[in-house]
Amino acid sequence: MKRRNFLRTIAPAVVLPSIINGFSMKAFAEMPLFRGMEALQTETDKVLVIIQLNGGNDGINTVIPLDQYTNLSVARGNILINSSAVLPLTGTTATGLHPAMTGMRDLYDSGKVKIVQGVSYPNPNFSHFAATDIWATASDSDQSLNTGWLGRYIDHEFPGFPAGYPNASTPDPIAVQMGVGVPLMFQAPGGLAAISVSGTSIFNGWTIDGANPAPGSYAGQELAFARSIAQQTQSYAARLTAAANNVTTQSPSYPTAGTNTLADQLKIVAQLIAGGLQSRVYLVSLGGFDTHSGQVDTTDTSIGTHADLLGKLSAAIKAFMDDLTFLNIANRVTGMTFSEFGRRIISNASGGCDHGVAAPLFVFGHQVQGGILGSNPTIPSVVTSNDNVPMQYDFRSIYATMLKDWFCLDQTAIDDIMLQPFSTLPVVNSACCVPPTPVITGSSAVCIGTQNYSVPATAGHTYVWDVVGGTILSGQGTNQIQVQWSSGTAGTVSVTESTP
């Protein structure tokens, strides 16, 4: 299926504050001067949940390289976790987790967590704002892009979005951001392709002031446009409400409401997914990781600010995973964490550490290939303030992996979205993208002559037929073939369906 080209004109986001009982929502769209409709490219019910750790997480005190402990104790003795407190991981003695991350340890030991070591990008930027934009857009460090990698993905799957949406075939928002702010990650060529939601109670009621007709002036056109976006958001709000109302019971594993903001967000995400919302991507966040000072307690390095943050992250993900199982949707959801950069190897005199390069990230879910990808960073015996954890994997390879092995896109589409080719990594079970064995329709009688055989067609897929005892006359590569049987002996017909 080929993509169409659309003429677009970009309009700013329309902000609709405080309109849904504790939730604020933002709707984003383009002025619909030209609209085009086309079926979505890839049929999938899979969901990707992204957890943003704002501030730059200290990877060395998160995934602890025990085999480098002697040199680490010299480089960061005032913040390093005591080796006896580090949580061991099944299958390795060289690496452990922060003692606050018992939930993640349990998930890792059950094969539901992949740790990817040393994630960054070439020539990293140490500015929070610039680095966050790089992760959001998947740009090179010397580029400035105005579209996000997921915005480009959404534009590929739903061309022209958000113009012409919602509609009968796509009634739900494609992406949902829990929290406030403008999500550059979801910026598509035609506008922001996400709805932003914040709050702790689900939707109740909506009113739009549209009784008076808009005047025929430029201001009236702007008012009419704003109303159209409000109506779009109203439609999405109704869908969110319906999905939320479909789920009345969830896992009791979550922390008490209000004590862990990340867990509160993930609980709503699970509720919406289980309730039938067809959104493909959710973005949630946890802040506070810019630990230049006071990272640990001065008397016990296993507790303190960073420990509290990692404890919340771990507890939230574990509760979320428990809930996905409870709601019977675990095989549909994969999650990943990211932070704009890591921290320096050496600590500072303020009980913290400064902006650095690479750090590990977590991929979690029932369909991940558990374990550790990459090696522990090598810590020199003498560490200076200029020494960093080196990059092993480009973060964009993880994005490309999610597009290929989770969302099942072909390589041409991935390269288009990522703007250049990136290798993929063994993170998610690629078998998730193998189509089910098709059921062949056709005569099973032994006879001489021609017979037709077919399977249900999937747009963009190819079909390789194998016939024993007969000859394919036409249709090889398609979902239907005609076969010439030249004898009355038994034969076989089989087919392999392949994605592009």
Which residues fall in each region the model found?
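Solvent-exposed loop segments of extracellular immunoglobulin-like
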Residues: 457-464
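Solvent-exposed segments in extracellular or luminal domains encompassing
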Residues: 479-490
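Feature for exported/extracytoplasmic and membrane-associated proteins, marking the mature portion
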Residues: 1-314, 319-327, 346, 360-433
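Proline-enriched interdomain boundary motifs that mark the N-terminal boundary
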Residues: 434-442
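Short beta-strand segments within Ig-like beta-sandwich modules, predominantly Fibronectin type-III
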Residues: 472-477
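A short beta-strand segment in extracellular, disulfide-stabilized domains
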Residues: 448-457
